[in-house]
């Protein structure tokens, strides 16, 4: 595996441009006889959500007192991976369409974990771009897992993340991608404060763009895990609900962050193990 990186400049300043933009993004191996690398993608971009089946809107939201962030209840539902025949930007692996059923509801962060929350829980400030309400970046899978555990939660599964990212809608969004996500055309090569773009149908922010987000699922190589959603570095072709990267758990890059999830609200687990759902 090879990771393309940008030199980091002390003080959180934007470094000079190096080569073309694709070379400044994280890129991972893709089966190719010529040995080239690219981002792996598996599904449609935001504008191809018409095939997603309808679902009830998200339910209640709560603040986790351990990190101070708001979490949204996402109902069960189903969606399709893969691209529509008319989508000309699909990668080869996206041609296969498959129905995914998320059988149980779950809680998920309304935003990416912020730097203020990360400092509060982990007593650490690893981020390259600085700002209390900016997403925590340069966070590895192991770090993200530890954070979620400390607040009584976990990383979402890839299917949970995708279902949440679709927003429970069967209609093509009327908003352009730029109103939903910080990505290559509008980011100015930096992350941005969370929740400054429009929410999706479940009320979630920045599911696409800003920073890649770790999920539980194992990746392509030994010990690797999956990253979702694209980042401020990526173009619309890579900022897809089912686009994915596979990376080692100790990868800490400045366009990588996360959000937490849980099947049960942490404060509603009793000593007997019974739970309360919304």
Model-derived features with residue positions:
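A short glycine-rich, aromatic-capped structural motif
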Residues: 62-127, 209, 257, 264
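Bacterial N-terminal signal peptides
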Residues: 41-50
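Bacterial N-terminal signal peptides that target proteins for export
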Residues: 31-42
